[in-house]
Amino acid sequence: ALEYGYETPESFTKAFTRFHGTTPIEVRRDRSKMQLFLPLHVSIKIQGGSKINYTVEKTEAFTVIGFERLFSFETSYKEIPDFWTEMYKIHAPNILAGKGPKTEVEHAIMENYIGEFGVCIEDAPAPGKFRYMIAGPYQGGKVPQGMKLYTVPANMWAKFACVGALPNAMQSVNTKVWSEWLPGNKEYDLAGKYNIEWYSADGDPDSTDYESAIWIPVIPKK
């Protein structure tokens, strides 16, 4: 884990096993190789007097690599955390035991920081379904069997900071974004049928100062 940028084996464990079941029902919810432009830092007050902090940034297209599965909107809240647990049990035991990566998949997990992103992609042909990826920024090289690539188009993103223990911190911000910020926003419309959860590999997901974020693609209103 240390070789691939994680400060300790424990930090990798936390990054890989964190809670990821926050995909909202019936809403659309990277660092490497991304070029950022014109960051706009904003803090707005919403109902109840609380504030939500976000940045608006443009990025070039970038590619993620990870494990993908099809989910139903109605059952995703339960099934996505189970998906993370399943992938952890199958692919991470050697790494977490301090033995280092031994298979192509294990090397890909470490080299591409799998677990940094949760990616929701609403392009499934079946109604009521969407693709979800446990992913990381693709660094190039062979794609092992069982893993897939997805290229996120160049976009303008509204990135909402979440600070606090999971899942409550992200769920709270997520609710505010979709129920209050987006419907009442006078500057941006939703763009694209994909969105991203970002999770820090450092810190304790149960801590009050743990950092994560919600990214949604936006376009200026005409």
Model-derived regions, located:
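A solvent-exposed interaction/effector surface
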Residues: 10-222
